[in-house]
Amino acid sequence: FNGLDDKVKIINDEIKNYANYSLKNKVDVVYCNPPYSKKESAIIGDNESRNIARLELTTNLGEVVDVASGLLKPNGVFYMVHDAKRLQEIMAKLSLCKLAVKELTFIKGKEQDCPHLIFIKAVKCGKEECKIHLPIVLNGENGELSDAVKCLYSKKSI
């Protein structure tokens, strides 16, 4: 962790276990890639792990946002990627949990596509001002990764 081992603690656990860590209002940053689809709106397949990752079977958007808010200290930052179709619901849940959206980046497969994902940066007890970034396009015209995505993967800024 670039010499920050004594300051960085990564917890990779199920959301239902967060209370075991005694971290209420103590965390600086929470990253989350929760399931995008409501259980009622999707077809459940045979692969249980895949279903849990994609569908709100063991948690839901409200719980994810509530837990993140509970963990974060004031001015702590919450990063989340989610389905762009649920933006209105996401914004309402974040606001309800005192998380102010500070940055939005829409993500689309190809240049001509509508965005299908959204990357959100929210701040606990933050002020109401939001920066909207240019969309990230995942693939170029030939199907290869776009230059922006190549830069992200190579850890260069875009």
Predicted regions and their residues:
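Conserved Class I SAM-dependent methyltransferase catalytic core
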Residues: L57-K108, D113-P115, F119
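SAM/dcSAM-binding transferase cores
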Residues: C114-I158
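Glycine/Thr-rich phosphate-binding loops of Rossmann-like dinucleotide-binding domains
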Residues: A19, E40, Q88
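Mobile active-site "lid"/loop adjacent to the S-adenosyl-L-methionine
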Residues: D28, P34-E63
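Short, glycine/acidic-enriched loop or turn micro-motifs at the edges of active sites
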Residues: N17, Y36, K124
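S-adenosyl-L-methionine
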Residues: F1-D28
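Short amphipathic alpha-helical segments
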Residues: K24, A42-G45, M91-L94
